[in-house]
Design a protein with these regions (language model features):
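Beta-strand-turn-beta hairpins that frame and shape the catalytic cleft
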Residues: 35-44, 169-179, 208-212, 262-268, ...
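Active-site neighborhood of phospho(di)ester-bond hydrolases with catalytic His/Asp-centered motifs
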Residues: 46-48, 67-72, 96-103, 165-166, ...
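Core catalytic region of metal-dependent phosphoesterases/phosphodiesterases
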Residues: 47, 52-172
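Short, conserved loop/helix-junction motifs that constitute active-site signature segments
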Residues: 60-62, 89-94, 206-207, 231, ...
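Active-site-proximal segments of metal-dependent phosphoesterases and phosphodiesterases across multiple
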Residues: 115-125, 187, 208-246
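Binuclear metal-dependent hydrolase catalytic cores centered on His/Asp/Glu-rich metal-binding motifs
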Residues: 127-147, 173-212, 229-238
Length: 299
């Protein structure tokens, strides 16, 4: 199915005001399971937006078959942050650990690292590396750390304890999981693309047989409402998810205050942001069980 560009795509708040007239959004309050998943189901544990704050997490990460992190596992993508995250995720008990990048993983985005001296933003203005740093909030990181992160090549190779997805998929016991880091332009961070055609071109890469979709950005209308009352989600992502891909689950983060689960009656949307609006890692992981294809068992 061909997905078009919504005329209000540049204003997701206005777009959702129109779209919501024909949309169903049901909030779901899910409790953590107290028993193991049966043999015909895959238990998936979701987190996002931990921002190098995993040492301060006060909850236990539930056991499961698959662990998904939907991006922003660092503050700026520095090598030390990536190494520390890799060590942390390596200590989790899950057999399959899947990670995507978010807008904070500057060193993972080749448009920042190759070359460092030139970067083209969505408004087609070229900036030197210095002015890029001037545009980016540091979250307590030094400008030197930001510069070093942006200049670090092949940093993905340091994620040795998980599977890193970037416009790619992995199949776990017949369940197809696709991960993509892109999001509508946001403060000239990593993996930013303009709303509309540029975003849609990324979503067109997602296979139609995806069971679990992992993006960093939310779709418009689900887990994307900011504290200012503005919607930050992508209009074309919602349209793509609902009309072409139709996954069973859509996992994301990015908008901390959007944490939680919702459904449109067919697809379950999960904003798994661990950090809250104040960048405190207070939100517990979200867990779900997905039924395996007929005849497939974990054993």
């Amino acid at each position: 199915m061909k997905i078009g560009i919504h005329p209000l795509t540049a204003d997701p708040t206005a777009a959702w005001r129109e779209l919501s007239q024909h949309q169903k959004v049901v909030k779901i309050n899910a409790k953590l399971p107290t028993t193991q998943a049966p043999s015909d189901k895959l238990r998936v544990v979701c987190m996002s937006d931990t921002h190098s704050l995993t040492p301060f997490i006060k909850f236990d990460v539930p056991a499961g078959d698959v662990f998904i992190h939907a991006g922003d596992f660092t503050k700026c993508g520095s090598l030390q942050e990536v190494i520390e995250f890799n060590n942390w995720i390596g200590n989790l008990p899950h057999k399959h650990k899947i990670v995507i990048a978010g807008n904070h993983e500057l060193s993972f985005d080749r448009t920042f690292t190759h070359p460092f001296s030139v970067h083209t933003s969505g408004d087609h203005q070229k900036h030197t590396g210095t002015s890029i740093l001037d545009d980016i909030p540091t979250l307590g990181m030094s400008k030197d750390a930001l510069a070093e992160a942006i200049k670090t090549n092949n940093i993905k190779d340091y994620l040795t304890n998980c599977t890193y997805l970037e416009d790619s998929e992995i199949v776990v016991h017949g369940i197809k999981i696709y991960g993509t880091p892109w999001q509508p332009e946001f403060c000239k961070w990593a993996f930013n693309v303009p709303r509309g055609e540029a975003c849609l071109s990324k979503w067109e890469m997602i296979p139609t047989d995806t069971d679990i979709l992992v993006t960093h950005t939310p779709p418009v209308g689900h887990g994307d409402l900011c504290c200012t009352g503005v919607r930050a989600g992508c209009v074309e992502l919602l349209s793509t998810v609902q009309n072409r891909i139709k996954p069973k689950y859509h996992v994301f983060g990015h908008i901390h205050e959007g944490y939680g689960i919702s459904s449109d009656g067919k697809i379950i949307y999960i904003n798994a942001s661990t950090c809250d609006l104040n960048y405190l890692p207070n939100n517990p992981p979200i867990v779900f069980d997905i039924t395996l294809p007929p005849g497939v068992q974990k054993s």
